C-alpha cells in the first residue's frame, strides 16, 4: 500500500513512529532537504494525477487526444516513485543527486548551524545565509553544490526558467522616469553599483543583462531614492527591488539588535525578530515566490530571508523567525498577527517594498497596510526607503503614494496596461459553450509542448472543465479558492513540474505568480476588466521568452471589453479579427456599461505620474467629486469604488458616469 501511495516522491507510509499526524508543508519547502523523516501529505488523491479531490486520468493511457503532445511517453498517474523520474517531469539529476522527498519536519530545522555569529540556525533558514558579518566585513560562506542545484537548477532544468531568446529586445521598450535628479541607468551587472557577491549570485541564476526596470531601479534605490515603478508583467520587478536591497545589505551589514532582546552573548536565538527589509505582497503563493528568489540572491551571505503568510502553521513560522530574520517577505494579515504577538518589530526597517500594491488594496488590505506602515514602530517616511512595484498603478494607488513615499521617482517601463510583444495574441469568436469546448480541444490537440494555463471565471467552471479534460485523457488539474492551501500548492507543484501540464484556474493564478515554461494561456472565459486580461496573459512570454495567448470572445457576453481588447491588440501589433472591430464599433454606438475611462488605471493615466498630469480632488478609492487625472480618469464624475451617482454609467467606452469599480460580471472571485 505504501508503494501505491507514493505520490510524486511523497512517501505517505514513511513517517515517524506509528505514522502519526503529518505537519503542514509550506510552499517554499517543496522539494527541500533537511530534518528527519520524509512524510507525505496527510490527505490527497490516491488514484491519479488530477486535481486534489478528483481522480486523475488512468495510468494506462498511452495516447492522448489525436496523438497530441500530451500523449505517448508521459505517465500522469500520481502514483509511483521519485517524481524526477516520472514522464513529463524534470529530467533526472546528475552527480548521483536526486530530488529529495517533501519533508514537513524540516521547517526551520536542519543541521547547518550558525547564525549572525554562529548560533542555532539550520535547514532552509541557513540555506541562503551561511555567510557572516565580522569586524565590519562581509564574509561569504563556502560553496554548497547541493544548495546551488536546489536554488539555481541546471541549464537544462525545465523547472527553472532562464533568460529567454528575446531578452535583448527589451532594449526597444520605452522607459519614462519622472522626478528630479533621476540617475543614469545601468546596462550591465557590475561593480559599481552592485556588490561583487550579489553579482556572483546573479551569474549563477544565468541572468546576462538587466531588464529595463532593473536598469533604472538599481541606481535609483542604490542612490537612496524612493520609487514607484510600473512595468510589464514578467519584466523582472522582483530583481528590481531585491538586487539593490541585498547589495546594500552586503556592503553595510546588519543593524544592531536592541539589547533587551538579545540572547546569550548577544546572538543566537531571539524571541523577537528585527528585520531590516520588509516586502509585502497580497497572496501566499506570491510571497513564497519572492522568498525563493531572495534565497537565490542571498546565497552564501549573512542575510537571512524569512517568509510568513496565513494558512500555514504559525508555530513553525515563529521558530523560523526566532533563528534570525533580516529580510522578511509577508502577507499583511499574518504580519499584523505576528506583530500583535510581540514577535516582530519593525523599528529597524530600512527598506519597505509593496509588491502588487494595487491588488493588495483591491483585496481589502488597506487597513492592515496602513497599520503596518503608520501604526506600529516602523521608521517614518523620512527615515526609510519605500518602493512600490506593480503592473498597474491606478489613481487611488498614486494617491496612496503621497502618504507612504517621499520625493520619489516614478518609473514607467513600457506602456503599463499593455502586453508584451513576446506574446502572440489570438482572439477566436464563439457563439455558445459547445464552440468553446470544440476550440479548446483543437488547441490542445495541436499543442507543441510546455504548460497550458486555462482561465475561467467561476470555481464551478474550473472543476467542471478540469474533470471534462481528464475524461478526454488529458492531464489536467484545477486551482481556485475553495481548494485548501495544501491542495492549491500540490496542484501548482504538479503543474510546474509537468506532471499535469494543463491547469484550469480562476483569478488566484492571474497575478504575480511566476510559473516557468508556460507556453500557452487560454482565456476560456474573458474577464470583465481588461487589466485582468493583461495580467492573465502575462503568465506566458515571461523573462523574454515567447508565448501564445488565446481568448474566446462571445459577442453576447464580452462586448463590454471589445474596444479595450482591440486597443490591446493594436498596441502589441497583433492581428485584428474583423468580428472584434465590429463588436467594438457596435458597442461605441450603443452606449451601455462603460468603465469610465477604461478600467483600473487604463485610459485614466495609470502609467503616468499624476504629479505631472494633475487631477481632481475627488475620484480616489471611494469615488465622488473631482474626476481624477485631468477629468474623466479614475473615478471620474462620481464613480470610483462606491462613489455616488456613477453606477455602471452610460456612454460606452470611456463614457461618462464613471463606471463602477467593482465586478460587473458577478462571477469573478479573487480566488
Swiss-Prot record:
Classification lineage: Eukaryota, Fungi, Dikarya, Ascomycota, Pezizomycotina
Single Gene Ontology BP annotation: positive regulation of formation of translation preinitiation complex
Ranges of compositional bias, category Polar residues: 59-75
Highest taxon of the lineage: Eukaryota
Name of the protein in question: ATP-dependent RNA helicase DED1
Main location: cytoplasm
Catalytic reaction equation(s): ATP + H2O = ADP + phosphate + H(+)
Record's comment describing the protein's domains: The Q motif is unique to and characteristic of the DEAD box family of RNA helicases and controls ATP binding and hydrolysis.
Motif Q motif: positions: 187-215
Similarity comment: family membership: Belongs to the DEAD box helicase family. DDX3/DED1 subfamily.
Pfam families: DEAD, Helicase_C
Motif DEAD box boundaries: 355-358
Cellular compartments per GO CC: cytoplasmic stress granule; spliceosomal complex
Domain Helicase C-terminal: 422-584
Localization: Cytoplasm
EC number: 3.6.4.13
Keyword Aminoacyl-tRNA synthetase: no
Composition-biased stretches (Low complexity): 94-105
Function noted in UniProt: ATP-binding RNA helicase involved in translation initiation. Remodels RNA in response to ADP and ATP concentrations by facilitating disruption, but also formation of RNA duplexes.
Record's keyword terms, sorted: ATP-binding, Cytoplasm, Helicase, Hydrolase, Initiation factor, Nucleotide-binding, Protein biosynthesis, RNA-binding
Domain Helicase ATP-binding: 218-411
Location of the region described as Disordered in the Swiss-Prot/TrEMBL record: 1-141, 588-612
SMART domains linked: DEXDc (SM00487), HELICc (SM00490)
Gene3D superfamilies: P-loop containing nucleotide triphosphate hydrolases
Gly residues bias (residue ranges): 107-130, 589-612
Stored PANTHER family: ATP-DEPENDENT RNA HELICASE DBP3 (PTHR47958)
Record GO terms (molecular function): ATP binding; ATP hydrolysis activity; eukaryotic initiation factor 4G binding; G-quadruplex DNA binding; G-quadruplex RNA binding; mRNA binding; RNA helicase activity; RNA strand annealing activity
Amino acid at each position: 500500500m505504501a508503494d501505491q501511495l507514493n505520490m510524486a516522491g511523497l512517501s505517505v507510509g514513511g513517517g515517524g513512529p506509528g505514522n502519526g499526524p503529518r505537519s503542514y508543508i509550506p510552499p517554499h519547502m517543496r522539494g527541500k532537504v533537511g530534518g528527519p523523516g520524509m512524510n507525505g501529505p496527510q490527505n490527497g488523491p490516491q488514484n491519479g494525477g488530477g486535481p486534489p479531490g478528483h481522480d486523475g486520468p488512468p495510468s494506462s493511457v498511452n495516447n492522448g487526444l489525436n496523438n497530441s503532445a500530451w500523449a505517448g511517453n508521459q505517465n500522469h498517474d500520481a502514483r509511483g516513485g521519485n517524481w524526477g523520474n516520472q514522464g513529463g517531469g524534470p529530467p533526472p539529476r546528475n552527480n548521483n543527486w536526486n530530488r529529495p522527498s517533501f519533508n514537513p519536519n524540516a521547517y526551520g530545522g536542519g543541521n547547518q548551524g550558525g547564525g549572525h555569529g554562529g548560533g542555532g540556525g539550520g535547514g532552509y533558514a541557513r540555506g541562503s545565509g551561511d555567510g557572516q558579518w565580522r569586524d565590519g566585513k562581509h564574509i561569504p560562506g563556502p560553496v554548497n553544490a547541493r544548495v546551488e542545484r536546489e536554488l539555481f537548477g541546471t541549464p537544462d532544468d525545465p523547472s527553472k526558467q532562464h533568460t529567454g531568446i528575446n531578452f535583448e529586445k527589451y532594449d526597444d521598450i520605452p522607459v519614462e522616469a519622472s522626478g528630479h535628479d533621476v540617475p543614469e541607468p545601468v546596462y550591465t551587472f557590475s561593480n559599481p553599483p552592485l556588490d561583487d557577491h550579489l553579482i556572483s549570485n546573479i551569474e549563477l541564476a544565468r541572468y546576462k543583462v538587466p531588464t529595463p526596470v532593473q536598469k533604472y531601479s538599481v541606481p535609483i534605490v542604490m542612490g537612496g531614492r524612493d520609487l514607484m515603478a510600473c512595468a510589464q508583467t514578467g519584466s523582472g520587478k522582483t530583481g528590481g527591488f531585491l538586487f539593490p536591497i541585498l547589495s546594500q545589505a552586503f556592503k553595510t551589514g546588519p543593524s544592531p539588535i536592541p539589547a533587551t532582546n538579545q540572547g546569550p552573548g548577544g546572538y543566537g536565538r531571539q524571541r523577537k525578530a528585527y528585520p531590516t527589509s520588509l516586502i509585502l505582497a497580497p497572496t501566499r503563493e506570491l510571497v513564497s515566490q519572492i522568498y525563493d528568489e531572495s534565497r537565490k540572491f542571498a546565497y552564501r551571505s549573512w542575510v537571512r530571508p524569512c517568509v510568513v503568510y496565513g494558512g500555514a502553521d504559525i508555530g513553525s513560522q515563529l521558530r523560523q523567525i526566532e533563528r534570525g530574520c533580516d529580510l522578511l517577505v509577508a502577507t499583511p494579515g499574518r504580519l499584523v498577527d505576528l506583530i500583535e504577538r510581540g514577535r516582530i518589530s519593525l523599528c529597524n526597517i530600512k527598506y519597505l517594498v509593496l509588491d502588487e500594491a494595487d491588488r493588495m488594496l483591491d483585496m481589502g488590505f488597506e487597513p492592515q497596510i496602513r497599520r503596518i506602515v503608520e501604526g506600529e514602530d516602523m521608521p517614518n517616511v523620512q527615515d526609510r526607503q519605500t518602493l512600490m512595484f506593480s503592473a498597474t498603478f491606478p489613481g487611488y494607488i498614486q494617491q496612496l503614494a503621497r502618504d507612504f513615499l517621499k520625493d520619489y521617482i516614478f518609473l514607467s517601463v513600457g506602456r503599463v496596461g499593455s502586453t508584451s510583444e513576446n506574446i502572440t495574441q489570438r482572439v477566436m469568436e464563439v457563439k455558445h459553450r459547445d464552440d468553446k469546448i470544440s476550440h479548446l480541444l483543437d488547441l490542445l490537440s495541436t499543442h507543441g509542448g510546455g504548460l497550458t494555463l486555462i482561465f475561467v471565471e467561476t470555481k464551478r467552471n474550473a472543476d467542471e472543465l478540469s474533470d471534462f479534460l481528464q475524461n478526454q485523457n488529458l492531464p489536467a488539474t484545477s486551482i481556485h479558492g475553495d481548494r485548501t492551501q495544501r491542495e492549491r500548492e500540490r496542484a501548482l507543484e504538479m503543474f510546474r513540474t509537468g506532471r499535469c501540464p494543463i491547469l484550469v484556474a480562476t483569478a488566484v493564478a492571474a497575478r504575480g505568480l511566476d510559473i516557468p515554461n508556460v507556453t500557452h494561456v487560454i482565456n476560456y472565459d474573458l474577464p470583465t476588466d481588461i487589466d485582468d486580461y493583461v495580467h492573465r496573459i502575462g503568465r506566458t512570454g515571461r523573462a523574454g521568452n515567447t508565448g501564445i495567448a488565446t481568448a474566446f470572445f462571445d459577442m453576447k457576453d464580452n462586448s463590454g471589453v471589445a474596444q479595450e481588447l482591440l486597443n490591446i491588440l493594436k498596441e502589441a501589433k497583433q492581428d485584428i479579427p474583423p468580428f472584434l472591430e465590429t463588436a467594438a464599433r457596435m458597442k461605441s454606438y450603443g452606449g451601455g456599461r462603460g468603465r469610465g475611462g477604461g478600467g483600473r488605471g487604463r485610459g485614466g493615466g495609470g502609467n503616468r505620474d499624476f504629479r505631472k498630469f494633475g487631477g481632481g480632488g475627488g475620484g480616489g478609492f471611494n469615488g465622488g467629486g473631482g474626476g481624477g487625472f485631468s477629468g474623466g480618469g479614475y473615478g471620474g464624475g462620481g464613480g470610483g469604488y462606491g462613489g455616488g451617482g456613477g453606477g455602471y454609467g452610460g456612454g460606452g467606452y470611456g463614457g461618462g458616469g464613471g463606471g463602477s469599480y467593482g465586478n460587473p460580471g458577478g462571477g469573478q472571485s479573487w480566488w
